[in-house]
Amino acid sequence: MVDFAEHRKALLCNDAQSIADYESAMGEAVKAVSAWLQNEKMYTGGSIKELRSAISFQPSKEGMGVQQSLQRMIELFLNKSLKVHHPHSLAHLHCPTMVMSQIAEVLINATNQSMDSWDQSPAGSLMEVQLIDWLRQKVGYGSGQAGVFTSGGTQSNLMGVLLARDWCIAKNWKDENGNPWSVQRDGIPAEAMKNVKVICSENAHFSVQKNMAMMGMGFQSVVTVPVNENAQMDVDALEKTMAHLQAEGKVVACVVATAGTTDAGAIHPLKKIREITNKYGSWMHIDAAWGGALILSNTYRAMLDGIELSDSITLDFHKHYFQSISCGAFLLKDEANYRFMHYEAEYLNSAYDEEHGVPNLVSKSLQTTRRFDALKLWMTIESLGEELYGSMIDHGVKLTREVADYIKATEGLELLVEPQFASVLFRVVPEGYPVEFIDSLNQNVADELFARGEANIGVTKVGNVQSLKMTTLSPVVTVDNVKNLLAQVLAEAERIKDAIASGNYVPPID
């Protein structure tokens, strides 16, 4: 027999008991988060081995109920999670979040709107369109509706290279009737499969290669060019590469420029890249997933000069905009280029709806069902105002330059790349230490500090050198916070360096 009372209690609906349970459990959850925030330890989950033994999924026929399940998750998940707001959590583009973003998440989750069709998110659809228009004006595209919120940079970059490829093939290939070739209708011409190329720098985000492979073009379709000493795309090498490809009969569909590379935070010379792509008739996509935050900067906006010249742009708001994951956007300069991915489904975006101006946003997205993540950015901008928001973004740039100066002046530390944005690449180099052990030393310093829950420092490569990385984007981290962290780094290196050199060291990750 169906127990509708229990069904109603389990759903978030207008049932009195459901509402009471929701209010009570949400109150308990907020209290638990508050307690977790006040614990000053960055991480208390232990090693991978310890976590693996502690975590167990426990389904049952009867269930354990809301309260018991919540208490179990407070201990199993919340208390074992990384505190991304902690001043020593600097490894990745993994930001602390705005209070308004967290409040917006409650509204997003409770209403459960879906952004594919207007009748599934009436207010949200119109709000997203307005926010896209505002973002377009901020980047310099001008007013318009060509753009959509996405899950993040990988999806936005996929949209950029997908549209660029199909635009390129339509421009350079004809079907049997002499019309521009439609990849959407007819697939990829065999000749185009071999000859269409996308260019990016050697430090571009891996999603460029990954997306081209998913599009059926393979890694072979991506040509990388070197970077200069500032980790920016070498524009002389770019021009030589494009000339060489053209001479070979290849067609460059797109050049992906980066505004804020993942490791160095490098911003490529956007205006010069646009000049070169214009010369060869190629699309220019800018991956500004990180550096795009500077469109709100009070001080450093000029670092993005030329962004307005691009054909498409990736923005991520769950990086330097301090929004909860996930929240990104794709902006398209010329709305006509959406034709390469347009698909009409009678039950979502019918011709009738389009004739009457109904904003069914599925037409602009690779996703169908999609969260109203735009609400987080909307509420943050309206509540903070652009000046305060810009100040919070600018802090990371200023802090990074101060940290770089400190590293250069500190014995035992070496700055590997002069920073541009909000990332510091450095390493520990003890005086007289055997060079063959320096990479291992730096790797294990980071691993040791994380295993004890004291710091989360990134590990990457600069050329062939093992590098430590601090992504200094937090608007509340101070120079003194970072100095204290660097003192821990040096102390840890001193503690383990002899064991590493003698071969007696046991890595904490084992």
Curated annotation (Swiss-Prot):
UniProt KW keywords: Decarboxylase, Lyase, Pyridoxal phosphate
PROSITE patterns named in the record: DDC_GAD_HDC_YDC (PS00392)
InterPro entries from the UniProt entry: PyrdxlP-dep_de-COase, PyrdxlP-dep_Trfase, PyrdxlP-dep_Trfase_major, Pyridoxal-P_BS
Keyword Lipid biosynthesis tagged: no
Required co-factors: pyridoxal 5'-phosphate
The UniProt record lists the keyword Lyase: yes
Family of this protein: Belongs to the group II decarboxylase family.
Entry protein name: L-2,4-diaminobutyrate decarboxylase
Biological source species: Acinetobacter baumannii
